[in-house]
Design a protein with these regions (language model features):
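A polyanion-binding, active-site-adjacent surface
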Residues: 1-223
């Protein structure tokens, strides 16, 4: 299987949603309002096993968005995205590599509730296509409200969803694509890097090469 935040394939290629489609949340104009709606969401089966809706966090006017797959155990418990081991690595990339504060960017996931294999929280899995489709209006509206100058997709699910492709992240990383006119830079999910050597993994160098392209696009200093 292609590398991603969890083993297995997610079927993202089956999903066909764009911001041009009718969004049930189109009249919502702030992230706080959208978060309130998301907190009561029952649009898919993930609501039955979640502890918390993990909406996203960061600067509502961020120039840069990071979009991952879905919450894990720690995120489900805290209500915050990317706060486990993968989140620690992402935070280091943002703060030590890009010389930004985590609160300067916006971090979200394709789905807002934790997908697990058995619904009991023993093992995470990629979201199913119908779960992504059900949750996608939240992400699409987040993008519309924030209006970022660039998006970094982390792993297969978010990359395949935004770019409407069946290609895997191994082929797509290192390239620049576009979603609704916004530059998109696919790269490996931090958890995949951690599972394959962490700080000593050559994948980390690949991620850093991808991030430098983002920085150049945004006009950020590289030293």
């Amino acid at each position: 299987p292609q590398p991603g935040p969890a083993a297995g394939e997610s079927g993202m290629s089956e999903v066909s949603v764009s911001s041009g489609a009718s969004n049930p949340f189109a009249d919502i104009v702030t992230l706080d309002e959208l978060k309130d709606v998301a907190s009561e969401c029952r649009r898919c089966r993930l609501c039955e096993t979640r502890k918390t809706v993990v909406f996203g966090e960061g600067n509502p006017k961020a120039r840069l968005m990071f979009i991952g797959e879905g919450p894990g155990k720690t995120e489900d418990e805290t209500g915050r995205p990317f706060v486990g081991r993968a989140g620690e690595l992402l935070t280091r990339i943002i703060e030590n590599g890009m010389h930004l504060r985590r609160e300067d960017v916006y971090i979200a996931n394709v789905v807002k509730c934790r997908p697990t294999v058995d619904g009991l929280g023993t093992r995470d899995r990629p979201p199913e296509a119908d779960e992504t489709a059900a949750c996608s209006p939240f992400l699409l509206r987040q993008i519309e409200i924030i209006k970022p100058d660039a998006i970094v997709t982390l792993g297969n699910p978010s990359t395949r969803f935004l770019l409407k492709t069946t290609e895997g992240i191994t082929k797509l990383r290192g390239t620049e694509a576009s979603f609704e006119g916004i530059p998109v830079f696919p790269t490996y999910h931090p958890s995949y890097v951690l599972r394959n050597g962490g700080d000593s993994s050559p994948l980390k160098k690949d991620v850093w090469a991808d991030i430098k392209k983002v920085m150049a696009k945004l006009g950020l200093p590289l030293n």
